[in-house]
Swiss-Prot record:
Expressed by the venom gland. Belongs to the peptidase S1 family. Snake venom subfamily. Contains 6 disulfide bonds. Snake venom serine protease homolog that may act in the hemostasis system of the prey. The keyword Secreted applies. GO terms for cellular component: extracellular region. Keywords: Disulfide bond, Hemostasis impairing toxin, Secreted, Serine protease homolog, Toxin. GO terms for molecular function: toxin activity. This is Snake venom serine protease homolog. It is found in: Secreted. It comes from Crotalus atrox.
């Protein structure tokens, strides 16, 4: 899920 990676930016 891209949102999960975005939250870890």
């Amino acid at each position: 899920f891209l949102v999960a990676l975005y939250t870890f930016r």
